[in-house]
Regions:
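Flexible loop/hinge segments that line or gate small-molecule binding clefts
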Residues: 161-202, 307-319
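Amphipathic helical "hinge" segments at domain boundaries
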Residues: 15-23, 31, 43, 84-149, ...
Length: 370
């Protein structure tokens, strides 16, 4: 832990005696000098070592216990816990406020995967904590809480649900000795590993599926780059037209409804017979537009829709859902944190390929938290 990010320093005053004692004892646990399951010094020994009052030492020991570093075992004394937080408490950071209009289907799927992993780990097992509204940095209560958790070494590693551009020059990116991993669409220049959602596999598999249905005229609705799709469209013997390609401003997702309606109002010989929706946050709007137009699915239009899976997603709609299993994403992130904690340099990029719903509905393998 670097002193420049110590919480007491952040608020402009030196740490008091209690927190000095806590910080030193915590360092000894984190360094392994006091290993998991090892006896913890008695309160009398701590009083003698630091020359502190019984009240100060009692308060310090009680707080270390509440943090999860130590536990009493009756007459046997006090011991370092077998699962101290610096080894078993992972933090997942969401850029935006939970439940806000910026909260996405991906965030929901990842949150559900986290809840399931915590349920399976049990009350005394490793845990994944979530922190939201990170983009507001010091204005966010979660940011301030997590900053203190990090500098006081109460976190095993940080998992950024998206690239953490807003967190530059903050302890969450600057503090030494903290394993980190980010989830992103592409490899990044961050000095820590990335779990990448493989867009190449999404493009290839969606068009291969539609070609297999005999479809040849493909439209796109959603955030996409035409230059990335054009080679794959051509490779599958398909065609598209400029007015079938509709990049959407995700700040106004409802615009997808009118676009979908218009696509199916074109003359029959100028109408697509296949549609790829490239963001799951648009799907409801697209389907509303198609319903208003009276489009018959899949007879008139076959759809591949992007999806973030969490093991709970189901759909009776006549479309194919293709995307990324949030449980698999989470498991990869946890594994990369653990790899770093073991002192091993992991691969810079761990790609997560796109899968169809029927390929991951048996449940995916759950994250190995330890």
């Amino acid at each position: 832990m670097s002193d420049k990010f110590a919480p007491a320093t952040l608020v402009g005053r030196p740490p008091d005696r209690k927190h000095q004692i806590m910080r030193q004892l915590r360092r000894e646990i984190v360094s392994g000098a006091l290993a998991p399951g090892a006896p913890f010094p008695t309160r009398e020994a701590i009083i003698n070592r630091f020359g502190a009052s019984p009240g100060t030492v009692n308060s310090a020991v009680d707080e270390l216990r509440s943090e999860g570093f130590i536990e009493p075992r009756g007459r046997l004394g006090t011991f370092v816990t077998r699962n101290p937080p610096h080894l078993t408490r992972y933090a997942v950071l969401f850029a935006v406020e939970r439940g806000s209009n910026q909260w996405t289907g991906y965030y929901t799927a990842l949150s559900n995967a986290i809840a399931e992993a915590n349920r399976l780990a049990g009350e005394n097992g490793p845990a994944i904590a979530t922190y939201s509204n990170m983009h507001r940095t010091w204005l966010s209560r979660d940011f301030r809480t997590l900053t203190e958790d990090v500098v006081e070494q109460r976190i095993a590693g940080l998992i950024f649900a998206t690239s953490p551009y807003d967190l530059r020059e903050t302890p969450l990116l600057e503090e030494d000795g903290v394993p980190r991993v980010a989830v992103a669409a592409l490899a990044s220049d961050w000095p820590f590993p990335t779990v990448g959602l493989d867009g190449v596999s999404f493009r290839e598999r969606s068009l291969e599926y539609l070609t297999g249905l005999g479809r040849r005229r493909v439209a796109l609705i959603g955030p996409h780059r035409e230059t990335e799709w054009a080679p794959v469209i051509a490779a599958n013997g398909m065609e598209t037209r400029p007015y079938w390609l509709h990049p959407i401003n995700m700040a106004a997702p409802e615009s997808a409804r009118g676009i979908a309606h218009l696509l199916t109002r074109l003359p029959a010989d100028d109408r697509p017979d296949a549609l790829v929706v490239t963001d799951d946050n648009l799907l409801d709007h697209v389907l509303a537009g198609l319903l208003a137009a009276g489009t018959r699915l899949p007879e008139e239009l076959a759809i591949v829709a992007h999806c973030n899976f969490d093991g709970t997603s189901t759909s009776a709609l006549p479309l194919a859902r293709l995307g990324y299993d949030a449980r698999r994403v989470l498991a990869a992130c946890i594994d990369l944190v653990n790899t770093q904690r073991r002192g091993v340099n992991p691969a810079a990029l761990t790609p997560i390929p796109a899968q169809f719903a029927w390929e991951i509905d048996p449940p995916a393998e759950e994250p190995a938290l330890i």
